[in-house]
UniProtKB/Swiss-Prot annotation:
Record-linked Pfam families: MoCoBD_1, MoCoBD_2
Designated name of the protein: Isoquinoline 1-oxidoreductase subunit beta
Species per Swiss-Prot/TrEMBL record: Brevundimonas diminuta (Pseudomonas diminuta)
Reactions catalysed according to its record: isoquinoline + A + H2O = isoquinolin-1(2H)-one + AH2
Lineage: Bacteria, Pseudomonadati, Pseudomonadota, Alphaproteobacteria, Caulobacterales
Transmembrane segments: none
Enzyme class: oxidoreductase
Task performed by this protein: Specific towards N-containing N-heterocyclic substrates, including isoquinoline, isoquinolin-5-ol, phthalazine and quinazoline.
Length: 781
């Protein structure tokens, strides 16, 4: 029985320039890859069947074009190139003739094995989680095509080879393109097992829970008749660079983002919300708003007032004329971001007395306490605070919902978690989730923000009220105002140091932060002893420190928070790596040598530290440092990857200004899926991490956000971006995720360089406000 791909609606794709001419008449889909015709692939050669789908991931056309479905959403990270190449590798497809189709929403079909089995594009789990799944998909498709050729030529299948979309029988010098075989394909009811030859394909450390069974049988005992997947030494596509499929349409204007989606007959809507999050409308004077030509509806929603009209200009003008009295929300109106941070810091200082949860430990607690009580041990500590941060995707939120007469509906939304959005919206619409078809356009940046529903919830409320197709648009001001931010966090790290041996014997982390997990997914929060691992997992140390303990506090405050790229790891590593340098300075030890002395059991960690020291010419540049310039080092193991980074920092004492001129980064992510994508991810992460470390913070006073747009929420400018040098340290280890790695070290690396210049570390993120208040003389650490 043939399994077909999810149906792709007939759509018209149009450039933004063309949209201006034909607005209101189009929708858009995501399909990448302009493919040339191939010799031998003709409609005449296979007149009866136009295409065949061996499984839900692959469709082979009679003209030789191969469509590959990508389960992950393209956020700019390269998923629509890296993931389809896993399929194409095992299929031996001609990459130039591959088109990429975006999957719809289905955990059952497209769920990520390393993300609770959900269709989840985040947490550096995309390439790792889908690696086996997609290789098997490609191998199944190749199996079908090879069996078809074997039947056609009456030869054993094991005598056949495949190369770039062609099946070959060298003994008889016969060949057939995949397209030529389509008409004869018979898809079996079941496929043989596939096994990997002694290859680890999943990371050992997985904070989403125990790693699930691999989807491929392992070489220790493959089933009889099982077929081996390719060994990495034979890869033709994986590990090699290739032009990204999504770049040409982005350059020529054909790419379809959520903001580009147009559905015939749709109305536009915007929602006015209160000055404090969570306020509901109490009384609405919409008389002036309804006078604006083109306005169809003004609706009170549970969380705001929606204005619906024929075009966005009318809607925006009408919304500005609304007069709304809002119901008080004393809980949220009492929130003050600075006060909350101070409370978190106090909790960290008194964590044990404040019922902190022991989230993780290495060694017995009695042994840890005993080491800290030893008279020959020096106790070093580091405390830090980190403000709320806006994820700041360049594309604000939008969503379209189109209801149908049979009670079903379709939705178009840029999201990192389509099935979660589907569930929220379907619940509001009063239909089953499978009655809401999800279309997933390109996303102009996710960074964790699009893990949570936003504009689609607005659209669902409006569509349920009026029964018409609606597109909801958020302005930049809406996006910032209604955003659940990266959590504020405080951390205290203590180290027991045996000075005579220059060794760290034990570490204690205490972390206090609010939780996104507790708010939206309490079942997972409870599974982690009512803690959020995204907040504290950064405290897990790969250094040779035998005794470690992490205590977590999750005080629930009234502001909504959401995961952000780097989660709490970027914040906790700021404290941890600053402390490591602080200890090295106390001991008059070189920061590189001190780390290497604590990485004897981590050859991968030691390798990236040595590599980045060589890249940055650490010994010479450190010796030449002075005059307000220094190098700073930070190292982080995370999600089966190892990263070391050196920053060259300049500090102007007279103006109290800090800048970063150069960054060197060595990264080991095990097997590399595509080198250029990994480097681009690291560069982007470093830039974002630099912006967050230096200047980004959200301030809330009495529940009111103190920012409205980028003029009062500053971010790093192009002129402030340093030279960035990334080197991949490839090993035979399992593939690791990449997306978050660049953010994790840049903050502490800058801080460590700053301390080498001034003798003191900064103890808050972002750094610029601390610099403005810093005394110009006298160390504080």
């Amino acid at each position: 029985m043939k399994t077909v791909l999810p149906s792709v609606p007939e759509t018209v794709r149009l450039s933004r320039r063309g949209f201006l001419v034909q607005a209101g008449t189009i929708t858009c889909s995501v399909a990448f890859g302009s493919v040339p015709a191939a010799a031998g692939d003709t409609a005449e050669s296979t007149p009866s069947i136009a295409a065949v789908s061996p499984n839900v991931w692959v469709r082979v056309h009679a003209d030789g074009i191969v469509d590959i479905v990508c389960p992950a959403v393209e956020l700019g990270q390269g998923a629509h190139t890296a993931l389809p190449r896993f399929v194409a590798e095992e299929l031996d497809a001609d990459w130039d003739r591959v088109r990429v189709q975006q999957a719809g929403a289905s955990d059952k079909v497209y769920g990520n094995p390393l993300a609770w089995g959900t269709q989840f594009t985040a947490a550096s789990r995309t390439t790792v989680g889908y690696f086996d799944v997609l290789r098997v998909a490609g191998a199944q498709a190749r199996f079908v095509l090879v069996q078809t050729a074997a039947r056609r030529w009456s030869v054993p299948a094991d005598q056949l080879e495949t190369q770039k979309g062609v099946v070959l029988h060298r003994r008889s010098r016969r060949s057939a393109t995949y397209g030529e075989l389509v008409a004869s394909v018979q898809v079996p009811e079941s496929f043989p097992h596939f096994f990997a030859r002694n290859e680890a394909t999943q990371p050992a450390d997985d904070y989403f829970g125990a790693a699930p069974p691999s989807v491929v049988a392992q070489a220790a005992g493959p089933a009889s008749g099982a077929i081996a997947l390719k060994h990495r030494s034979t890869y033709r596509l994986i590990g090699k660079d290739a032009p990204r499929k999504d770049i040409p349409p982005k350059v020529n204007g054909q790419a379809c983002y959520g903001m580009d989606v147009q559905v015939p007959g749709m109305l536009y809507a915007m929602v006015e919300t209160g000055p404090v999050a969570g306020m509901a409308p109490e009384r609405v004077d919409d008389g002036a708003a309804r006078q604006v030509p083109g306005i169809h509806h003004v609706l009170s929603l549970p969380h705001g007032v929606a204005v619906v009209g024929r075009d966005i200009f009318a809607v925006r003008a009408a919304r500005a004329r609304l007069l709304v009295n809002w119901k008080a929300n004393p809980d949220k109106q009492s929130y003050d971001s600075g006060q909350v941070l101070d409370e978190f810091s106090d909790l960290c200082r008194n964590g044990i007395e404040r019922n902190a949860v022991q989230a993780w430990k290495q060694g017995e607690l009695s042994s840890i306490d005993a080491v800290f009580a030893r008279p020959d041990v020096r106790i070093e500590s580091f405390e830090m605070q980190s403000d709320l941060v806006y994820q700041a995707p360049m594309e604000p939120q939008s969503a379209v919902i189109q209801p149908h007469a049979d009670g079903s509906a379709e939705a178009w939304v840029g999201t990192q978690w389509p099935t979660v959005e589907q569930g929220f919206a379907a619940g509001i619409l009063g239909i089953a989730p499978d009655k809401l078809t999800m279309h997933l356009p390109l996303v102009g940046g996710g960074f964790g923000r699009r893990l949570e529903p936003g504009a689609l919830v607005d659209a669902a409320h409006i569509v349920r009220a009026i029964g018409k197709t609606v597109k909801v648009i958020w302005s930049r001001e809406d996006d910032l105002k209604r955003n659940p931010f990266r959590q504020a966090l405080a951390c205290r790290v203590e180290a027991a140091v045996l000075e005579k041996d220059q060794r760290i014997l034990a570490l204690r982390h205490t972390v206090a932060a609010d939780s996104w997990l507790a708010r939206l997914f309490p079942q997972y929060f409870n599974a982690y002893q009512q803690t959020d691992p995204g907040n504290w997992i950064g405290g897990m140390v790969a250094y040779d420190v035998p005794l470690q303990r992490i205590d977590a506090l999750t005080p629930r405050r009234s502001v909504d928070v959401c995961y952000m790229r780097g989660i709490g790891v970027a914040q906790v590593k700021f404290a941890q790596e600053s402390l490591v340098d602080q200890i090295a300075r106390r001991l008059n030890a070189d920061p590189v040598d001190f780390r290497l002395a604590h990485l004897n059991t981590s050859p991968r960690g030691a390798a990236v530290v040595r590599t980045v020291a060589e890249m940055s010419d650490w010994k010479r540049r450190s010796a030449d440092a002075g005059g307000g310039m220094a190098l700073g080092l930070a190292y982080t193991p995370y999600s089966n990857a190892h990263v070391a980074l050196v920053s060259e920092v300049h500090f102007n004492r007279s103006e109290n200004t800090l800048s970063v001129s150069r960054v060197w980064c060595a990264v080991d992510v095990g097997m590399v899926a595509q080198p250029d994508i990994v480097k681009a991810q690291m560069e982007g992460g470093i830039i974002q991490g630099l912006s967050v470390a230096l200047m980004e913070r959200v301030q809330v006073a009495k529940g009111v956000l103190q920012h409205s747009n980028f003029h009062d929420y500053p971010m790093l400018r192009m002129s402030q971006v340093p030279q960035i040098h990334v080197r991949l340290v490839e090993t035979d280890q399992a593939m690791a995720g990449v997306a978050e790695l660049g953010l994790l070290q840049i903050g502490p690396a800058i801080n460590n360089a700053f301390a080498r210049i001034t003798g003191q570390h900064l103890r808050s993120l972002p750094m610029r406000p601390a610099l403005a208040q810093m005394k110009r003389s006298g160390p504080t650490a």
